[in-house]
Structures are given as C-alpha cells and as structure tokens.
Curated annotation (Swiss-Prot):
InterPro entries xref list: Ig_E-set, NXPE4_C, NXPH/NXPE
Lineage of the organism: Eukaryota, Metazoa, Chordata, Craniata, Vertebrata
Gene label: NXPE3
Residues listed as glycosylation sites in the UniProt record: 26, 237, 346
Keyword Secreted: yes
Pfam families: Neurexophilin, NXPE4_C
Main location: secreted
PANTHER family with a match to the protein in the record: NXPE FAMILY MEMBER, NXPE FAMILY MEMBER 3
Sorted UniProt keywords: Glycoprotein, Secreted, Signal
Gene Ontology cellular component annotations, sorted alphabetically: extracellular region
The protein's name: NXPE family member 3
Length: 559
C-alpha cells in the first residue's frame, strides 16, 4: 500500500512537471506570434473594413517609446497603422541623380477618353514616369498629387493615386460638375527623395531642436529640450504626470529644474544631406513640379440625368472619396449640406450661448483670427499673451458667446511659450464638463512632422481617450477635428515639414478617430483641391470654407 502511494505521488509530480513544460511552450509560442503577426480588422483609405494579417514592422526604437506600456489592443492598432503607412520603397541601391524621376520628361494620358462624360462618371488617368535621361523607370515610390479643376468655374477636386510599382501610376477622379474639366498631376517628391525623408524621420528626429530658459534671481541659463535627448548629461524630466507624454531638458548647471520659465524653438539643424541627396530636393526641378500630358489634358462633362441628382449630391458613408469639391469657390461636402455663413449675424446666431474651445497649432488659430475679425461682436480680450502663441480669449457679452484658443503641449515650434501655458490637449479636455452648448475643435499635426510616427500615435491616443470620455459624460458636446493640409515646399522645408510627412500624419489621424463620434473638417482636400498656391496657413477664402464647415456641424441645416 505504501509503495502504491509513492508511485501515485511520483506520477502526480511527473504530470505536474509535464503541465508546466506544456504551459511554458504555449506561452513562448503566443509571445512569438505576438511579436511576429497579429490578426486585425481596420478601415482602409477608402473607408472600407478590411480583414488582414498585420505584420509587425521592424523599426528602430526611439528613446523611451520602445518601453511604452500598451494594451494588446493599442499594440495591435499601432502595428496596423505603421503597416498601412509602409511606403513601397523600391528594392534598388543608390541611384544617381540622372536616373531619378524627372517630372519634365514624365507624362500622363487620359485613359477612358470619350467625346463627353456625365457628371458622376469616373475618369482614369495613367501616369508614366521617366528619368532625366528620358528612360522609363522600372519602379515606383514617387509621391504624386492630383486634382481636376475648372478655372472659370472656380471648381476643383482631388484624385486618388495608385502606385503599380513599375513606373506606372493610375489616378482616379470622380467628375462632380459640368463643363470643361482639366487634369493636373504634380510630382511632390521623387522616390529617391522619399528614401531620404524616411531616413531623416527615423534617424534624425532631433533636426528641429527646442530650448527652455531657466531663471532664479539674477542667474539665468538656457538648455536644449526635446522628446528625447542624447548622451548621459543630467536631465530635467518634464514628462506629464497624467498623459505620460515625455519631455526633457538638459539640467542647468546652477539652477534647479523648477526654475524653468518658458519654451521656444531653438532652430533647425543644417547640413543634413550629402551633395548627392541634395540633388533630389531642387525647387523648379523635382519638388512639386507639374507632369505634362501626352495628348489632351481636359475632358468635357455634361449634366447628369435629373433622376440622379439627389443620389450624387449627398453620397453617404465613410468611403466617400473625394469628400467634397469646390464650385464657385464654395466647398461642397458630398456627405451633407454645408451652410454658408456669409453674414456675421449668422455666426452669432449659431454660437449664441455657447462656449467654443479651439485647441492645437497655428492652423486652428486661424479660425480664432477669422472669427474675431469677421464677427464684430466677438471682442478679443488682451491677456498679455505672446503674439501668435496665446492663449487667446474673445467674448460676445450680449449673446453670451465665449471663444478660447490654446496651443497644444510640446513639441511645438512657437517662438516663446510660458511654461505655465504648456498644456496638453488631453488634460484640457478632461477639465471640460461639456454639454449641448459646448463646442470643441482640435488641430494637432504640423509640429510632429519631424518625429517618428510612434510619437504622433501616442499623442493622438491620449487625445482620443479624453475625447471619448468627454462624449461619454456629455454626449451632446460637438467635437470637430481639423485635418492636416498641404503647403508650399522648398529644398529646406521639405526636410522638416514635407507634404509626404504630413500625409502620413493625416492618414493616422483619420484612422484613429474613425468611429469615435467626432466631425472632420477635411483641410487636406480643401487646400489640395483649391486653385490658390499651397500654404501652411491657407488664404482667407479657404479658411472661410473651413469655418463654414465647422459651424455647419455646430448648427446643421434643419431637415
């Protein structure tokens, strides 16, 4: 009996050991799978749900970002975002300038040419790129922008570009108005330049540097600051306690970290490129240069049947592309009827008894400036804030309107921001009660263009969490997101704020806020589709259309 008991005990021990071994093997396999692949369902650029295997992208960790504590859902989302933004880099070695993309020898042709098209028809354009020796290129990776327009009608819309990775591109347009419609295709950057921009994004995120002034009594010191600082010198850790957003400054030699009084842009690093790389960034040669047509560059569009009018005028669903178009200089969204606020009284009536918060960079500060200029009853209060920095406040006491603007937290390239005014949007949102008379608009993008994408994803994750909480406690709060926009580019600005960088940020923004319950002002299409030159701060006619769209969300047309 004793022997049987010993055997039974031994058997149980062996069984326990076997179970532990199996458990360890399974855990190891799960961790391995988690590192390599993850199954995901996400929304593609067309707004359609796509089930896919998301491959974990191998990226160099940036500072402390590899030590982020992410939930499995957050990790999956980040991996899918990075995978979706993987630019199709050609598998070629170093390319000499003469073999890079030459917009002047490249051309496009209208494929489905016909005597005329009807409004609502699809127009397809084939682009073939060649090098400076007029030889066809065998790989893709160029960044193109495309639009259709009718100058006499002040009409315009953007097109969707598909890269076939063999030197050919196809552009798809939806013809949205009658008349003579012209096609315009531009090379923003050749694929050889994109490779340089990718390198800078991952290896040189400190190419814009920041500084802070520390002062105590008569002693003052200025040190460099950033999301991440190199070396082993002592640091002041200004990481936000609530959001976990990292920010550091080199510690002053004689002063405590608590003596910091401001933040400002230090400057831009010079000498980032070699002579060979510089050749890929030349104004008038290969930056935002037109690609000419081989044959007609226009088509004739006739009105559609009367029965089809309503179905095209308001196309429903997230997948609507383009999201809108210009006609007679007025933006016409395709998903809803936008109001025209041409009289200041219309805006006053809309915003009566409301508190409006504008958070973000200088592109949404333009909304504050437009509203306070256009609406005479909105009187700006002098808060003693630095010019172009804020915070700013405007009040209409008669109609009980309060309008506020505050810039987002670092990184921000403004001239001088007091330390007390360095506020993160997520924290500000957490302090808002919300309700039917509360309006929030957010624009956060331009100051993140020099950083790895994980930095921007983290910022939007924090903002989104705060937005969801705000809408949860006050569902009638109106929250509007302003997207990125295109801008003028030269050899230097391309290295810091290229449209290619901002296109990535814009894609992330749209995906992360899809399905959250916010409204979107599509500043990207509204600047790209317009006939005016691209600017970081668009001209007033474009800003007016943006504000009209914003106000249309706040005060929609009665149906």
């Amino acid at each position: 009996m004793w022997i049987n008991f010993v055997k039974l005990r031994l058997f149980c021990c062996l069984l326990a050991v076997l179970m532990v071994v199996v458990l360890v093997v399974n855990v190891t396999q799960v961790e391995y799978l988690d590192r390599e692949t993850a199954s995901a369902t996400f929304i593609d650029s067309g707004g359609q749900f796509v089930s896919s295997q998301v491959i974990r992208i191998s990226r160099n960790p940036y500072c402390g970002y590899e030590r982020q504590i992410l939930s499995s859902r957050e990790r999956l989302e980040e991996d899918s975002l990075l995978a979706a933004l993987q630019w199709q880099e050609p598998d070629v070695g170093p390319v000499p300038f003469l073999k890079s993309t030459d917009p002047s020898s490249s051309y496009f042709v209208i494929l489905n040419s016909a005597a005329f098209f009807r409004v609502g028809s699809q127009l397809e354009v084939l682009v073939h790129v060649q090098d400076f020796q007029r030889k066809p290129k065998k790989y893709g990776g160029d960044y193109l922008q495309a639009r259709i327009h009718s100058p006499k009608l002040q009409a315009g819309a953007v097109g969707r570009v598909v890269d076939y990775q063999n030197g050919f591109y196809k552009v798809f347009f939806t013809l949205l108005w009658p008349g003579q419609v012209k096609v315009s295709i531009s090379l923003v950057h050749p694929s050889e330049g994109i490779r340089v921009l990718q390198y800078l994004q991952e290896k040189k995120p400190d190419r814009v540097y920041f500084k802070s002034l520390f002062r105590s009594g008569r002693i003052s010191e200025t040190t460099e600051c950033n999301v991440c600082l190199p070396g082993s010198l002592p640091l002041c850790n200004f990481t936000d306690l609530y959001t976990g957003e990292p920010w550091f400054c080199f510690k002053p030699k004689k002063l405590p970290c608590s003596s910091r009084i401001n933040h400002f842009k230090g400057g831009y690093l010079k000498g980032l490129l070699t002579a060979t790389e510089n050749a890929f960034f030349q104004s008038g040669v290969n930056i935002k240069m037109p690609i000419n047509s081989s044959g007609p560059d226009w088509v004739t569009v006739i009105p559609r049947n009367i029965k089809e009018t309503n179905s095209l005028e308001l196309s429903q669903g997230l997948g609507t592309f383009p999201s809108g178009y210009y006609y007679k200089d007025q933006w016409r969204p395709r998903r809803f009827k936008m109001r025209q606020f041409n009289d200041p009284d219309n805006i006053t009536e809309c915003l009566q008894r409301k508190v409006v918060y504008l958070f973000g960079d200088s592109t949404i500060r333009q909304w504050f400036e437009y509203l306070t200029t256009f609406v005479p009853d909105l009187v700006e209060f002098n808060l003693g804030s630095p010019k172009n920095v804020g915070p700013f406040l405007a009040v209409d006491q008669k109609h009980n309107i309060l309008l506020k603007y505050r810039c987002h937290g670092p990184p921000i390239r403004f001239t001088t921001v007091f330390s007390s005014d360095l506020r993160y949007v997520a924290n500000e949102l957490n302090g808002i009660v919300g309700g039917k008379n509360t309006v929030v608009a957010i624009a956060v993008w331009s100051h993140f263009s020099t950083f790895p994408l994980e930095v921007y994803i983290r910022r939007l994750r924090n903002i989104r969490r705060a937005v969801v909480q705000l809408l949860d406690r006050s569902p009638k709060t109106v929250v509007v997101i302003r997207t990125a926009n295109v801008q003028e580019l030269g050899p230097e600005i391309s290295l810091f704020n290229s449209d290619w960088y901002n296109f990535q940020l814009d894609t992330i923004l749209r995906k992360m806020f899809s399905g959250v319950g916010v409204y979107l002002v599509d500043a990207w299409e509204m600047t790209l589709a317009h006939y005016l030159p691209h600017k970081l701060h668009p001209d007033e006619v474009i800003v007016k259309n943006q504000v009209d769209m914003f106000l249309s969300f706040v005060c929609p047309l009665e149906t």
